[in-house]
A protein has these predicted regions:
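Flexible, acidic loop-helix segments that line cofactor/substrate-binding pockets
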Residues: 1, 17-49, 67-75, 89-97, ...
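Short beta-strand and adjoining strand-loop segment in the mid-core
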Residues: 1-8, 37, 80, 172
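Catalytic cores of large soluble enzymes that bind and process phosphate-bearing ligands
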Residues: 4, 8, 39-46, 105, ...
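Glycine/threonine-rich helix-loop capping motifs at alpha-helix boundaries
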Residues: 6-35, 49-65, 83-90, 120-122, ...
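Conserved C-terminal structural/oligomerization subdomain of aldehyde/semialdehyde dehydrogenase
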Residues: 68, 75-172
Length: 172
């Protein structure tokens, strides 16, 4: 899930759309492909059901992607869902596939959004915040201290580096 302030949402969404268009998908034997199929048919079926649900719902829409096929593997296109509902299904449930949901919030509702981020799911493997304002960054880090197992500040979520950082545990 991604939370983006309204003041920069159009710019961010435009960049994401361009970047996703460059992702090559196909066989893992071809090293030009950045993405390959999802792990198994059950995963494919779950993710394709989610995409179908989004296409029918009023609270969300497919911004980019949304295609899938199991004719030559279990392929799900990289998909961005946008929603006006911060409690939408794809914001609260872990999908474990190439689908991300973006919620755009009013800039003046930053505190409320931080609470949403912290309360949305009892599970969160990784999280990150990107911010240029030191005050907001400091406040955010305090409020989100326990929101994810690994938390990055102005850096992409890369997951744990085994042997280099602690990993695992549970929220208190």
């Amino acid at each position: 899930r991604v939370y983006i302030p309204k003041s920069i949402s159009k710019q961010v969404l435009s960049k994401l759309k361009k970047q996703i268009a460059t992702i090559k998908m196909g066989s893992p034997e071809n090293f030009e492909n950045f993405m390959t199929a999802v792990i198994h048919e059950n995963s494919f079926d779950k993710l394709s059901r989610v995409i179908k649900k989004v296409k029918k719902d009023r609270d969300a829409k497919i911004f980019v992607g949304g295609g899938y096929s199991k004719s030559k593997g279990y392929f799900i296109e990289p998909t961005i869902v946008t929603t006006s509902n911060p409690k939408y299904y794809t914001m609260e449930n872990e999908l474990f596939g190439p689908i991300v949901t973006i919620y755009t919030f009013d800039d003046n509702k930053w505190d409320k959004t931080l609470s949403l981020v912290d309360e949305t799911s009892e599970y969160a493997l990784t999280g990150a915040i990107f911010c240029q304002d030191r005050y907001i960054l400091e406040e955010s880090v305090k409020k989100l201290e326990n929101c994810a197992g690994n938390f990055y500040i102005n850096d992409k979520c890369t997951g744990a580096v085994v042997g280099q950082q602690p990993f695992g545990g549970a929220r208190g």
